[in-house]
Amino acid sequence: LPSMRNPSAEEVSRMRLVTQAFEADRIELHLQPVVSLPHTKIRFYEALARLRLADGTLLGPGEFLPLLEASGRASDFDRRVLIRSMAIARHLVARGSEAIVGVNLTAHSIAEPGFLWSLAGLLDTSPDLLGKIVLEMPQHSWRHLDADHRAALAILRERGVPFSLDRATDLRFDPVALADLGIRFMKLPADLMIEAAEQADGRYAGPELDVRDFASALRRQGIRLIAERVDEGDMVPVLCDLGVPLAQGFVFAGPRPVKPEVAGEPMAPQPFGLEDAPTLLRRAG
């Protein structure tokens, strides 16, 4: 058996700082747009969480999520992010925007017994937002659903909550099976799709499905394809040629902070408001 090592003083300090920031509710949301192709009109915002330490340092998920997971706080974190995202969605609705908000759920939380059921109760408190919040789950989680997960997802689906598959590591999927689960958006890495398109027959996802047919095969099942991590300009025309309807990445706009009063956050320095977002994001695109 591998030996257990004691955490270093630096690791203990980082855990303490992250825990303090979380308990002080210093979670901040940034929004990154998902745009239509080829016209780059904003259709969707993905809510991306950050955690601000007491000294002002802003941490990305890769820096704090493993620590929250290790301390059993991941599901509480996801619920807080969802509540903030619901506030953002309500703000968008009040402004007459048709954009929806995607909320990432961690694999750790999804695996926790009762977590998905708790989301149904949370979303039931705001029936006016049904259809405006998309729950995003990683590919790995979708591939390892147990009976309880499926039952909870069925309840959410019946309430009109759309789902998205993201954090894909390959291009293999069954459009019919995804639709049966209630998935309405599917995020695939732009570089993997482009790499597959450069092959002789494009048959990356299986013997019957060519990457050039991804968008149409998904559309027939009511699923919209999103190319993610579109970070280079020369990717865009290739994705357009593949018929990809939606895309996300730094070539259009990076994540930008939301005003704290919109998301119900503690005050943070130099945020921008959703009323500014369309201008800023379209300029970036």
Located regions from the model:
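Short, basic/aromatic recognition patches
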Residues: 2-33
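Structural preference for long, well-ordered alpha-helical segments in enzyme cores
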Residues: 68, 81-88, 119, 152, ...
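Catalytic core of bacterial c-di-GMP phosphodiesterases, primarily the EAL and HD-GYP domains
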Residues: 73-148, 229
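A short, well-structured catalytic beta-strand-centered motif of the EAL phosphodiesterase domain
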Residues: 28-66, 184-186
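Short acidic-capped amphipathic helix/loop micro-motif used as an active-site/signal-coupling element
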Residues: 53-58, 82-86, 167, 249
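EAL-family c-di-GMP phosphodiesterase catalytic domain
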Residues: 1-10, 37, 51, 107-109, ...
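Catalytic-core regions built around general acid/base machinery
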Residues: 119-125, 151-159, 213-217
